[in-house]
């Protein structure tokens, strides 16, 4: 059995491998209770939502930032220039919340309004700029092993391949490429987007992913508080299964109660 260790991103240790979002909840109260039920440590916040929404400041005030590490994201940005500008604003938001040393940014560059698929070229361009500005960059990408490796090589702190389109609840549609990314990566791999139920979160962890990021599946569940707990259990179970090591698949059956060396008397 493999020994477990902390999730380390940008030199910071985290005990939870479940990251969560703050969008789509019916109320701030439901959001906060759900966040607590996940036992997560990293919470992502859409900078533009806080910036533009009249209740944006209220969102920041509702969350106890001594319990959670803020992960500002650049959702709503269609090109690298926009993403860099919003990332800089996000760093200031983190400071306003009391996290002076927080340089984390979840990099999203999405010009596609229908399927919300990330732009690989603009993502790479933005990542290069942000790394030079001392950001801890967590880029959201398609399940593209070549892009993932390139982002690692330029200095990203994680890669975050999608399971399926944002909010679709379709689960992990490209297991082969996700597995290749995990196999080739020397930085944490966080599966982001598309997870709909705890079994899919567990599946991602069983593959060897270092964590998952979930928002819609919790926020839009009939009972977000219960789903938050369930996702926590799913991630933990998947991680334990990965560490334990699954049995090898084989074509033929193998009796669990063999008849060899049994007395015939």
Curated annotation (Swiss-Prot):
Record keyword Transferase present: yes
Ranges in coiled-coil conformation: none
GO terms of biological process kind: thiamine diphosphate biosynthetic process
InterPro entries, per database record: Aldolase_TIM, Thiazole_synthase_ThiG, ThiG
Designated name of the protein: Thiazole synthase
Catalytic activity annotation: [ThiS sulfur-carrier protein]-C-terminal-Gly-aminoethanethioate + 2-iminoacetate + 1-deoxy-D-xylulose 5-phosphate = [ThiS sulfur-carrier protein]-C-terminal Gly-Gly + 2-[(2R,5Z)-2-carboxy-4-methylthiazol-5(2H)-ylidene]ethyl phosphate + 2 H2O + H(+)
Record: active site: 106
EC assignment: 2.8.1.10
Family: Belongs to the ThiG family.
Keyword Transferase: yes
Lineage: Bacteria, Bacillati, Cyanobacteriota, Cyanophyceae, Synechococcales
Enzyme class: transferase
Pathway in which this enzyme or protein is active: Cofactor biosynthesis; thiamine diphosphate biosynthesis
